[in-house]
UniProtKB/Swiss-Prot annotation:
It comes from Pseudomonas putida (strain W619). It is an enzyme of class 1 (oxidoreductase). It catalyses: betaine aldehyde + NAD(+) + H2O = glycine betaine + NADH + 2 H(+). Pathway: Amine and polyamine biosynthesis; betaine biosynthesis via choline pathway; betaine from betaine aldehyde: step 1/1. Binds 2 potassium ions per subunit. This is Betaine aldehyde dehydrogenase. SUPFAM superfamilies: ALDH-like. One of its GO terms (biological process) is glycine betaine biosynthetic process from choline. Involved in the biosynthesis of the osmoprotectant glycine betaine. Catalyzes the irreversible oxidation of betaine aldehyde to the corresponding acid. It comes from the Bacteria. Dimer of dimers.
Length: 490
């Protein structure tokens, strides 16, 4: 019997059975254990969720800003009280180390919710004078029922990133988590209800993107879709959302981000940054800086520092807080990553570290891939051009600043970029020329609630987090008021 039994849908403030008996398995990628049987939503369930969300949204939007803010703050408190429990569930479901989920996933998700809870009373319109007897005022009104579609790498954090601004602005949200990692999002729905959110304002439908996701994106009474995932799927979601009813969309998609290390950089610090940009969360982060550019004359010294740090990685049971490198999210994804590693070897890249599946002892039960570093890479290699979404670093050399900027930008993606240098002028000069939406100087990876995140080119549309995201969950109504007489031309 599965450890967590059968997981139902969450609609209208409670768990309900799906309209069919179909389920899918939630699997612990560290051991292969079946954690739960998760029900698949039907099209009829989607209709129930939309109707429930419409009812709840009217109640929610009619509350005062302070009432909504207090409920969201209460949810923040509950998230923090249950942090360790939720973190362990996230570890079991995703394979991410508990040392990561305990201090990052729920913590940063709660921070975003707290940030938007504080902004609820700040949603304001404007007053625009026209003449002595007339003025215009604007209202920022909620969109209505919105949809969030999450990725498998940060399940509860992404659910909070999407629901926080949506709910703060007075909307309802129907959330569809990834089929691979659905469990913590259902717990989030419980927490919202416990905090006092009206029934229906946050519903969770589990199932495949091909079915449930499409039913949601095509639904005529959904006003906005926020999607996190791959670029190919994102294009389909965007086409579906726009062709059905011209929905607004936010897309956080793939990346193949460059990390440029300059000749004057502190090489130890640069190596530490490169490690975080490639191996945190076992390399399953959309913003990973997998193309590491190093001046040719510094390549050997940099390789030595990277190899030394890779040797210190503590791969193992993700439930052990001493572990800092767990398995990949699924056995299917492991095969995809191993395929890219094989391609890298075939195309002539040299393996500096790793390059294989970990199979010794308990590793054999899980989807573990060794932290892998390729060097002697060229821009035309598959591992350099395509998003792998795993623990695979590619080291490339360059000669001039102009050259490395051109090569860094030579990609269909534009999600993130970073520069390591002690020259502040050079740092800003390079960053301003890089075609990426999220950039770091002498750092990598932090995405605080206040920081808008999103991509250029085929890495996304719109932004999440920051004040600008809140505006994307409202629409402006303009009202002209005439205090004096009115003249007709007829």
């Amino acid at each position: 019997m599965a450890r967590f039994g059968t997981q139902k849908l969450y609609i209208d403030g409670g768990y309900v059975d799906a309209g069919s008996d179909a389920t899918f398995e939630a699997i612990n990628p560290a051991t292969g254990e079946v954690l739960a049987h998760v029900q698949r939503a039907t099209q009829a369930d989607v209709e129930k969720a939309v109707e429930s969300a419409e009812r709840g949204q009217k109640i929610w939007a009619a509350m005062t800003a302070m009432q909504r803010s207090r409920i969201l703050r209460r949810a923040v408190d509950i998230l923090r009280e249950r942090n360790d429990e939720l973190a362990m569930l996230e570890t079991l479901d995703t394979g991410k180390s508990y040392s990561e989920t305990r201090y990052v996933d729920i913590v940063t998700g709660a921070d975003v919710l707290e940030y938007y809870a504080g902004l609820v009373p700040a949603i304001e319109g404007e007053q625009i004078p026209l003449r002595e007897s007339s003025f215009v005022y604007t209202r920022r009104e909620p969109l209505g029922v919105t949809v969030g579609i999450g990725a498998w790498n940060y399940p509860i954090q992404i659910a909070l990133w999407k629901s926080a601004p949506a709910l703060a602005a007075g909307n309802a949200m129907i959330f569809k988590p990834s089929e691979v990692t659905s469990l913590t999002t259902l717990k989030l729905a419980e927490i919202y209800t416990e905090a006092g959110l009206p029934d229906g304002v946050f519903n969770v439908l589990t199932g495949s993107g091909r079915e449930v996701g499409t039913w949601l994106t095509e639904h005529p009474r959904i006003e906005k879709v926020s999607f996190t995932g791959g670029t190919t799927t994102g294009k389909k979601v965007m086409a579906s959302a726009s062709s059905s009813s011209l929905k607004e969309v936010t897309m956080e998609l793939g990346g193949k981000s460059p990390l440029i290390i300059c000749a004057d950089a502190d090489l130890d610090k640069a190596a530490d940054i490169a490690m975080m940009a490639n191996f945190y969360s076992s390399g399953q982060v959309c913003t990973n800086g997998t193309r590491v550019f190093i001046p040719a004359q510094m390549k050997a010294a940099f390789e030595a520092k990277i190899a030394e740090r890779v040797a210190r990685i503590r791969a193992g049971n993700p439930e052990d807080e001493n572990t800092n490198f767990g398995p990949l999210v699924s056995f299917q994804h492991m095969e995809s990553v191993l395929g890219y590693i094989a391609k890298g070897k075939q195309e002539g890249a040299r393996v500096l570290c790793g390059g294989e599946r970990l199979t010794e002892g308990d590793f054999a039960k899980g989807a573990f891939v060794a932290p892998t570093v390729f060097t002697d890479c060229t821009d035309d290699m598959t591992i350099v051009k395509e998003e792998i979404f795993g623990p695979v670093m590619s080291i490339l050399t360059y000669e001039t600043e102009e050259e490395v900027i051109r090569r860094a930008n030579d990609t269909e993606y534009g999600l993130a970029a970073g520069v390591c240098t002690n020259d502040i002028t050079r740092a800003h000069r390079i960053i301003h020329k890089l075609e990426a939406g999220i950039c770091w100087i002498n750092a990598w990876g932090e995405s605080p609630a206040e920081m808008p995140v999103g991509g250029y080119k085929q890495s996304g549309v719109g932004r999440e987090n920051g004040i600008s995201s809140l505006a994307q969950y409202t629409r402006i109504k303009s009202v002209q008021v005439e205090l004096g007489g009115y003249s007709s031309v007829f």
